[in-house]
Each structure stands twice: as structure tokens, then as C-alpha cells.
Amino acid sequence: MAVVMSLIGVARDVTDLVLLRLVAGLVGGYASASIVMVGTQAPRERAGWALGVLSTGALAGNLIGPLVGGFLPSLVGIRGTFFIGGAIIAIAAVATITLVREDFDRSVDVKLKTMSKITKQSASSPFVIASLLATAMMVLLANMSIEPIITVYITNLGVSNQNLTRVAGIVMACSAFGSMLTAPRLGALADRIGAWKVIVGCLLATGLTMLPQAFVTSWWQLAILRGLMGMTIAGLLPSIAKLVRHTVNESNSGKTLGYLQSAQFSGQVVGPLLGAQIGAHVGLHEVFFVTGGLLLLAAMANQFVRTRFISEDVTRV
């Protein structure tokens, strides 16, 4: 990834840029592998908290990265920005190799490690996994749905063109900032009361904070609501990853957590497309109505799965 990012800095034309970005996407599996590693190495009773801390780090990067990326070109140029990005990735790679230790032993009997009553029941229901993957996609879809319309929507709120980019960046960053504040706490809450309850509660809260965003009259109101939405949405991905970790056999946990990452990437793709189509053909306010409605439907669907497919003695997982 460090090499590919640096090569983008010497791209000759658009074709080179597109191909290198494609390769970057193909080799950019660090996030997926880190979730798999934390999910499988952390103690089961602390998995929610550990994944919440990991989520906080990722969200901090999403918050700081665009700010640094917007600042560096004026100092080192656009191409130089890619070289610096490659160097940062190389530092992360060296730090991971030298500092991170994995307790992995292929000879361990995975059945003795993980085949508990919870695993046996949940593994028999692929519908549970499908529901979790769909929910993960919905989380990113909801968070990214306003990306194509944010500048137009903020313009309608009276923001001048000279401040438009800055205000749009603040509004989008508020969601990540709110998630940073609550992700570890909600992950720990999932360890205490059960991930299913956290998922259903966070979906309801996120849907309810999405709907009022259609009625704001000033950009700062939108920023506050996006921050609140970030605080509620933060508990979803750690809780989903925790459930996936508990639901499948140890031998399949890495593969299934990889599917979870693919579902999240799908949400990142579908969200902006859906938001753009609704905004262009129906209206800007309807983007929030549709997204909020989908989140509320997802909450009801997860509650149905929880009560229909999960027995009472394992709902605290």
C-alpha cells in the first residue's frame, strides 16, 4: 500500500491514476485484517470494548486525514502529498510488524476453543449472519448518503460560496467526531448488556436523529444533529463485529469478518449513489426521510432476528 500510494505521486495521466487507485483498493486490506485480528485475539468478554477502541482509531483517521490532505498540497504540492501518505503507511507497516504480537497456533483444537452453546445455535442460522452483514452495510449507507448533496443542502441553508467548502467539511467531520467520543463506551456497553440490545437501540436512535436533519434552518443545527448521529451510530459496527465473532466457529471467524468489511464497503458505495439519486429526482429533504426510514426498518428487522432466531439465554451476547 505504501508503494502504490507513492506511485500515485508519479502518475502520468488519468489512466495511471485510475489503475493505481484500483490497485490501492485491492491491496488495502489493513482495516479488514486489523478487525479480524482484534476480533479473534481479544477476550470474548472484552471484544466489544476492543473493537470500539479500534473503531475510534479508524474514525480519528477519517477525521484527521481529509484535514491534513487539504493542508499539505499548499506546502509540498499535490504529488508530494501522495509521497507523504506513502511514508505514513510505511511507518504504520513497520510499527505493526515490530510492535503487534499475534497469539496464533494452528494446532489448537478450535472446537474446544469456541464451540459453545452460543456458537452451535447461531452457526445453524445463516439468516443471522446475513442480517448482521446487511445491518453493517446500512450503517455506512446512512453515514455516506448525504455526501453528494451536502454542499447543495448547505447552500440552501444560507451559507455563502466562499465558506461552503469549510462548512461542509465541518458538518461531515461532526459525525466522525461524535463517533470518536462514544465508540469505546458503546462497545463496552455491548459487553455488559449484550450486543443485540445495543444494535437495536443504536439503530433506533440513529434513525430518529436522521429525520430532524431534514428540518434544519441553519448549518450549525445540521452539524449538531450529525454529531449526535455519530454518537449513536458508533455502537453499531463494534457490536456487529462482536456478534459475528461469537456467531461463527473460530475457524470461520476471519473469513466472516472479511465479509463484514465487504458489506461496509458496499454501504460506502451504495450510500452516495442512493443519496444522489433521491436528491436529484425527489428532493434533498427526502434523502434524510428515506435514510432514516431505512434505519428504523433495520432496527425492527434486527429485533425480529433477535427474538425469532436467538434463544433467551444467548441474547446477552
Language-model-detected regions and their locations in the chain:
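Structural signature of the two symmetry-related core transmembrane helices
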Residues: 1-6, 86, 197-212
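Helix-breaking motifs and short loop linkers at transmembrane-helix boundaries and internal kinks
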Residues: 10-15, 215-217
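Helix-to-loop junctions at the C-terminal end of transmembrane segments
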Residues: 181-194
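Cytoplasmic helix-loop-helix junction between adjacent transmembrane helices
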Residues: 20-58, 242-243
